[in-house]
């Protein structure tokens, strides 16, 4: 009897593991860790110290995963009503709310200890503040309270480059804040494009996203304006001497592409274009930070 029991229980173990992993939003965390790594590299003119590098990436990743799991927990009711999220572990009942809370608390606590002990207290507390900003202030309150939810709450999501910088230097620097500004301005057009595509679902669950409260055309205008502001912000690393020609060329090309996509969305919209803008924004941020990294090592 033992052997059949072992075989039949194996799929549930695999499913549980995958469900917990899904709650950490691994794709989002991976992009975030890229910006953390770039922040680390730009902070150091030489080779990165091994301990802050490994402990910093691991601790920040764990606390980011904890914040994502708390997001799943808090949003479980509305997730069950939206086509994009109804199959998540909590709405489907594959993981209970209690277990999700324990998982998030354990993951976040361990990440905090790793950062505090093996990196530095400054990075640990800044990462904790980001977790609170995203999981509680944004998810639990702002998301349901104001159409400017993503603008205000976006500050928490813009912190990773600063976290990477402080992880290896244990201090603030103006250059790190420039990277925060870039992600802060990138966040609204990124999420508003998705909100346009999913506006009916957001309206159904009473989430006051900008397309729901102010209309699609107003949101398209805001996306276009933010992409222009973002393009200006992307030039700041060059203007302050932080980055060189390679980054300037790459960032200019990416900014032109993003503005063009936003202009198309405003004046030549067609079915599926909002999601194209959303996807382009992801590649924009990823390639922009890769350009920062390459430029740093090629032109330093």
UniProtKB/Swiss-Prot annotation:
One of its GO terms (molecular function) is protoheme IX farnesyltransferase activity. CDD domains: PT_UbiA_Cox10. It is found in: Cell inner membrane. It comes from the Bacteria. It is a multi-pass membrane protein. Keywords: Cell inner membrane, Cell membrane, Heme biosynthesis, Membrane, Transferase, Transmembrane, Transmembrane helix. Pathway: Porphyrin-containing compound metabolism; heme O biosynthesis; heme O from protoheme: step 1/1. It is an enzyme of class 2 (transferase). InterPro entries: Protohaem_IX_farnesylTrfase, UbiA_prenyltransferase, UbiA_prenylTrfase_CS, UbiA_sf. This is Protoheme IX farnesyltransferase. It comes from Shewanella oneidensis (strain ATCC 700550 / JCM 31522 / CIP 106686 / LMG 19005 / NCIMB 14063 / MR-1).
């Amino acid at each position: 009897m033992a052997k059949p029991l072992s075989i039949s229980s194996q799929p549930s173990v695999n499913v549980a593991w995958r469900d917990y992993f899904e709650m950490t939003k691994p794709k989002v965390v991976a992009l975030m860790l890229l910006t953390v790594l770039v922040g680390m590299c730009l902070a150091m003119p030489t080779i990165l110290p091994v301990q802050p590098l490994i402990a910093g990436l691991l601790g920040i990743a764990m606390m980011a995963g904890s914040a994502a799991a708390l997001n799943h927990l808090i949003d479980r009711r509305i997730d069950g009503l939206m086509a994009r999220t109804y199959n998540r572990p909590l709405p489907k009942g594959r993981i209970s709310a209690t277990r999700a809370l324990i998982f998030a608390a354990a993951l976040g606590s361990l990440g905090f200890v790793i950062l505090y002990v093996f990196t530095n207290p400054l990075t640990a507390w800044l990462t904790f503040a980001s977790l609170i900003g995203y999981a509680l202030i944004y998810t639990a309150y702002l998301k349901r309270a104001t159409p400017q939810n993503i603008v205000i709450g976006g500050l928490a999501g813009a912190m990773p480059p600063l976290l990477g910088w402080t992880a290896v230097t244990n201090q603030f620097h103006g250059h790190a804040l420039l990277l925060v500004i870039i992600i802060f301005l990138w966040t609204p057009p990124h999420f508003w494009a998705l909100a346009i595509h999913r506006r009916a679902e957001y309206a159904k669950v009473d989430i006051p996203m900008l397309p729901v409260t102010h209309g699609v055309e107003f949101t398209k205008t805001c996306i276009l304006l933010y992409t222009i502001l973002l393009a200006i912000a992307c030039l700041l690393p060059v203007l302050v001497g932080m980055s060189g020609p390679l980054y300037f060329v790459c960032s200019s090309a990416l900014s032109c592409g993003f503005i063009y996509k936003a202009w198309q969305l405003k004046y030549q919209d067609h079915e599926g274009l909002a999601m194209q803008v959303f996807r382009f924004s992801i590649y924009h941020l990823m390639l922009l930070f890769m350009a920062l990294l390459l430029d740093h090592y090629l032109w330093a």
